[in-house]
Regions:
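N-terminal Rossmann-fold cofactor-binding loop
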Residues: 18, 42-47, 63-65
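N-terminal Rossmann NAD(P)H-binding glycine-rich loop of SDR-like oxidoreductase domains
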Residues: 3-37
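Conserved Rossmann-fold cofactor-binding substructure of NAD(P)-dependent oxidoreductases
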Residues: 54-79
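Glycine-/Pro-rich loop/turn segments that contact NAD(P) or position catalytic residues
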Residues: 84-155
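Glycine-rich, N-terminal phosphate-binding loop of Rossmann-like dinucleotide-binding domains
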Residues: 16-17, 63, 85, 115
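Hydrophobic anchor at the start of a short beta-strand
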Residues: 39-40, 60, 150
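Conserved glycine-rich Rossmann-like NAD(P)H-binding loop of the short-chain dehydrogenase/reductase
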Residues: 37-44, 83
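Structural motif
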Residues: 11, 79-80, 110
């Protein structure tokens, strides 16, 4: 794997960086860059939103979170990762793919997962939540079992 010069910080991979729902990923990139931290922003399309991320000084990579090769390429050389993704029918598949790649990569200091507040009120047999909320709960379970250094955020 690529390594930066001794004493320099490894990039932080931010997924969902160009997302428009809540703009959380974009905000994470902006805050990290304001602190002069190296950021690799993963986006689905190279468009004006990707250009805006580049303007912050972030490195931008284009990829699909459901493709292990794309995730592995984006993660290569990174030390930490922020996983966020908008509401999507592919959320569960993407999260499992990202978790599997991150576990195989084996060099993350932190894996920050943007979950949902409602997850704290759920359990194995609850039934009142939406499909997306259930998927977030399942992802938290899998990440907990993964052995990754996970931080769950439930805004």
């Amino acid at each position: 794997m690529d390594r930066p010069p001794e004493g320099s910080l490894l990039p932080i991979l931010v997924t969902g960086a160009a997302g428009s729902v809540g703009a959380v990923g974009r905000t994470v990139v902006e805050i990290l860059r304001q602190r002069d931290l190296p950021v690799r922003a993963m986006v689905r399309r190279d468009d004006e939103r990707a250009e805006a991320l580049r303007a912050t000084g972030a490195e931008v990579v284009v990829g699909d979170l459901t493709r292990a090769g794309d995730v592995a390429d984006a993660l290569s050389g990174c030390g930490r990762m922020y996983f966020g993704m908008g509401v999507s029918a592919q959320y569960l598949e993407a999260a499992m793919t990202v978790a599997a790649v991150a576990r195989a990569y084996g060099r993350l200091e932190a894996f920050v997962n943007m979950s949902q507040l409602t997850v704290s009120e759920m359990d194995l047999t609850s039934t009142s939540e939406s499909v997306q909320q259930r998927h977030h709960w399942l992802v938290e379970q899998v990440l907990g079992w993964s052995g990754l250094p996970v931080v769950q955020i439930r805004p």
